[in-house]
Structures are given as structure tokens and as C-alpha cells.
Amino acid sequence: AEGLNREQYVYLANVSEQAERYEEMVEFMQKVVVGSTPASELTVEERNLLSVAYKNVIGSLRAAWRIVSSIEQKEEGRKNDDHVSLVKHYRSKVENELTQVCATILSLLDSNLVPSASASESKVFYLKMKGDYHRYLAEFKVGDERKTATEDTMLSYKAAQDIASADLPPTHPIRLGLALNFSVFYYEILNQSDKACAMAKQAFEEAIAELDTLGEESYKDSTLIMQLLRDNLTLWTSDVQDQLDEP
């Protein structure tokens, strides 16, 4: 599929999404991004296709990593050294793929997407995405690499949050999605459950207060994310209770 035009790549990305061939979907959308000039920003449809493509590829790798890691822990518990070294080696293979996928999308974001984003909505979208992929690195990296990934996540989410708070309504699905992921970062990566809860709660309450401003088109997206924020809050506050209740 070389030398096609933008519309053709977008069409093939749609086809590959329906066929659930997400690696190819990523490749088609990379072509769209690299072929677009700063003057021709991605449309909302193209932006979403890019996001879905990478989210699926990284999603299956993250799931694989979690499974392999839990097998590794079990084998360590059993003191089975041969199996431990095999599964460690296999885990590092999955980690190399994770690193590679994150590197390619982060490079597209830094070189093309973030610099050419003009509207606040797209700036927040891409900065959030940048935070997400640094966070996925922070999930499995250790030592200095983890520290760097964590700092980069914080900077990206913070930059996105500054723009979102100033320019997007509290009910905007991208602003809500940012609050959701930023709060998960506080909870899972930084282990700051109080900060995570405060952020999720604030985003939820600010959106509830302005529910009447919700447009027809984003109603479903926004209420879905609000539900997720609330689910996390319920989960996290019960976790905090557990910690407090433990003798």
C-alpha cells in the first residue's frame, strides 16, 4: 500500500479496524500523519483512528505483559529457577515490543502532532496521548528509565490539564478522559491514592454541575467517562478504607 493518498490510507485504516488488524491500522495511520503538513491537521475522524489503532496494539501488549509477569511471580514463589529465567527472558521480549510501540507514537506526537495542533481540543488530545504512552512505559520500566517516564507523564498531563481547564468545558469528553487517566497515573504509578481520589472527584463533580451544557453528540462519551471516574472512586475509596481498617 505504497504511494496512496490520504483518503485512501484513512479508508484502509477503517477496513483494517473492522478486520481487527491493528498493526496494519497503525501503519496506515502513520502514513496519514507523516503525509500531513502542519497546515493540514488531522480531522477528528483521523485523530480517533490513530488513537484506536495504537490503543489496541498497546492494549494487547500490556495485557500480555501482565500475564507473563504474574506467571513469573508464581514461578519465583515455587523456586523453579529454570522456568524463572525462561519467563524473565520472555517478559523482556514483550517489554522490547512495548518500548518500540511507545517510541513510535511518541515520536509522531513530538515531531508532527503536538507542534501542528492549533485548536485547544487537539492540543489537549495529543498531550494527553503523550502522557498515556509515557505512562505505559512507566508501568514496566525500572530505575532511571521509570523515573524519566514518570516525569514525562507528569509534564504531558500537566500541560494538557492547563489547556483543558482554561479552554474546554468540564463536560468535554477529552477533558474528562484526561482527568480519568491522570488520576489513574496518581493511583497506579505514584501510589498517591488521596491525590487520585481528589482529582477524579473534582472532575466528576464539575461535570455533574454542568450536565445541562452537554451537547447531544458528546453526551454518550461524556457520561461513559463520568461513570468510569465514579467506578474508580468507589474502588479507590474502598481500598483506602481497607488500609485504614487494617490493624
UniProtKB/Swiss-Prot annotation:
This is 14-3-3-like protein B. It comes from the Eukaryota. Belongs to the 14-3-3 family. It comes from Glycine max (Soybean). InterPro entries: 14-3-3 (IPR000308), 14-3-3_CS (IPR023409), 14-3-3_dom_sf (IPR036815), 14-3-3_domain (IPR023410). The gene is GF14B. One of its GO terms (biological process) is signal transduction. Pfam families: 14-3-3 (PF00244). GO terms for cellular component: cytoplasm.
